Amino acid sequence: MKLSLDWMNDFTPLKEVGLDAILKKIAISVCEIDDATEFRPELDFVKIVRIESLEKHPSADKLQIAQVFDGSSKSQIVTGVTNVKIGDLVPLAIPGAKLGDKEILESELRGVKSSGMLCSEKELFLSEEGNGVWILNGLDQAEVGKTIRSFLYYNDIIFEVDNKSITHRPDLWSHFGFARELASQLRLPIVFNPFESLWNFDLSVKLPKVLENQNAHSYYASSISGVSVFPSKRKFQSRLQKCGVRVINNVVDVSNYVMLEMGQPTHFFDKKFLENQGGISLEVSFAKKGESFALLDETSPALEEEVLLIRNQGKPVAIAGVMGGKESAVQNTTTEIVMESAVFMRERIRKSIRSTGIRSDSSVRYEKGLEATTTLPVIRRALNLLKENGCSELKASEPVGFLHIPHKEVRIHTDIHFINAKLGVTLSQGDITDILERLHFIVSWKGEHLEVLVPKFRHNYDVTIPEDLVEEIGRTKGYDTIQVSPLLAEVKTPIRNLNRELERKCKTFFAIALKYHEVFNYSFQSYKENEFSGDPKLSVKIKNEMPEEQSVLRNSLLPSLLKNTRTNQDRFSEIKIFEFGRVYFNLPEPENEKKIFAFAVSLDKKSSEPDLKLLEEDFLKIKKEVESFLESIQIYEYTWKIQQETIFHPGANLCLVARSGKDGLETIVGNLGYVHPAILDSFELKKRVIYGSFEFERIVELWNQNRKVSRFVTPSQFPEAEIDLSILVGEKENTNVFTDLVKLERIPELKEGWVYSQFMGGNVPEGKKSVSYRFRLVNYERTFTQERIKEISDQLVILAGKNGFVLR
């Protein structure tokens, strides 16, 4: 965005401050400035001169020798133009002037000295066309000796503001708004406020009709007569050109001028065109799909239903806040107009921009969110500018329209301690009041608490919470004035999050020690998948429209892990995965949600594998891994029990039982087993899958009970010993039965025992299996003797015999 320093000086005496001070304050307290440059400084070397005499060139028929006067001295110019005469006022580029890539030098043309060049508007880059020298006779303030830059009101500095740095400040998207901000920051007075302009409306002018609805915050229209259309006065043209806006005529230029000055767009309709549509009845409404009409940019886009329009008698005449229609625009013959001043909802303007692809200066301002009560002051200011710009016989009707929420107020409550703590400084009540009142806030104190009434031009989306006030005070005081101080932090013992801590331990052990891979899945699955793992009636249905396969929240991690296994079954011979996730139930809190740690293992055994020995070995291997995991988190006291669950194969599932809580009651902590073949088939799995899960909160409870108990035992300095024992057990009998019996014997040297192999067939009786156990012996006092090892071995043999087990 471009801003004119000369224009802003109309509202506050910025030129008294100095450019460096202004730029510094803008950079520190307002926004980013990309550039600040003199506008067309090369025109300082082009002066208005009067032609004193004209003579033919002695050596060239097409050249003339002109003597010109610049108010202080005469110069001789050789020129080839034919449209000048004695007494004409014309622009002269003196030696040293640079016009584009051309530098003007003193020269001789056919032996005659020439001290400059008489210029056309095209040569001065003021017009695309130029027939001969620019004749300035009779033009207002065309005085001999004046520079063309001064004559055109080009003596100015243009600020180029980085738009993204003020996108949250719609009040700064205008010359007055920016000047008001600088006046506050630099402690300057406001000498002219365009929002306070007055106008006497004429009751004799017929009122337009405006239909009220909720499609705009505010919408007013005024009927205006006595309009004459011709080029704008030089001041208006100059200010628009300096801001990069194309000059059109004295009516349209005022609309653009008001937008750049006050920040609120307006639009002028040709009144006769509206009347020819059946009368003037303006309404803000939405487009019909595919509707189209010609716009000012010569396009006729097919509109979507989300585009907001201005209609007259139901016919579209403008895209609201974006661009007017071509047919209803002001023409050279226009004598009566209807002025629109409105504030639209920023969300609707954004949708119109997105749908049409049209981004105009008006829409850029509307999409920021303008203050709705400015519509009437803008009309009064525009009428004054129309009169100033040549429409001296102007008459206007009282504006007709509507304003929703005219008395909106935003009050913020905070206290001095909050402000000082946030800024890291110590400000007094007087300091805070001074800064906020300079920024047009109204402040009232009650002890150390303050109430702040936000000015209307800031209260829409900009300043709404106490932190916004802190920012206003900080930027105005200057962040560079806040002293740097080292950060101080109290050294405290960190609060331990046991759940998070144990979760990391579990993940680390499974991923590193056991070589599992962690997976992440969505919590959505189908109602049918919930039937596998519990009562589907307890399923939590998702309210959003979702496909059937993602219509409920999961009640088990099993379906997710089986789908992961299916995806990878043809890629890897061995799959070991785990997941931490939540499951959900349609139950009262806290039973409605549980955290589960689950894993799935596929070890290349087909779902139809007949060799039960191989299957049991795999199962025991995974069971051993689970036990090593439990040992790693200091859970030692537990038992495995057979418990039938529908998700598991009837002959291959266990539940993990442990005592927890103060009452020491046995609780099921987890389960382990081969997934039921029917479930494997429904997931199109070709291989056997072992699935295990833990209710995480139960594991946390057990770990928390045991983690403070030191179970460290000094390693024995004497060699360990092992005893192997093979017995016959029933084909379907649990192999844990014998190890549990051994534990009850409480043999001092017995450290642990486990199954290390199984065998069926051969010379093993039918219905039986041979199970080999290995027992580890540790003595902390002496080296094992053969006699002691034999005693323990005999004790185990006797134990087996007493309980009906046959030795192998």
Swiss-Prot record:
EC number: 6.1.1.20
A Pfam family per the record: B3_4
Chief subcellular location: cytoplasm
Domain FDX-ACB: 716-808
Cofactor: Mg(2+)
Gene Ontology BP, a term: phenylalanyl-tRNA aminoacylation
Protein name per its UniProtKB record: Phenylalanine--tRNA ligase beta subunit
